[in-house]
Amino acid sequence: MLEVYDDAVGACRPGAALADLDRRIRERIADAGYPGQPSHPVCHGVGARAHEPPYAHQAGGGTIEEGMVLAIEPGIYWEGGGGLRVEDNFLVTADAPEKLSSFPDGVVRCT
């Protein structure tokens, strides 16, 4: 899932189509053995509310623009409960997406 997340973050550039980002994430998850996942948007805007447009969706339109704040959240879920999702918020800049939290990516061991 971290590889899918990293790929999604890298594709989050001004001018990129939101539908292409959605398709890219879902294809990577399907290739890993989880077709049809996730059931929620894989990327959405963040502003006055935690979830707001734009929403990345294969059938949708729109492009990523510099200055947008986007939540990238690929995930997989198991029937009967449980799942795995990696999520963070990013400011879209001309050079590269800027992560807005200081929490480290990767696996964190809690003891």
Locate each region found by the language model.
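Active-site neighborhoods and metal-handling regions in enzymes and metal-associated proteins
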Residues: 1-111
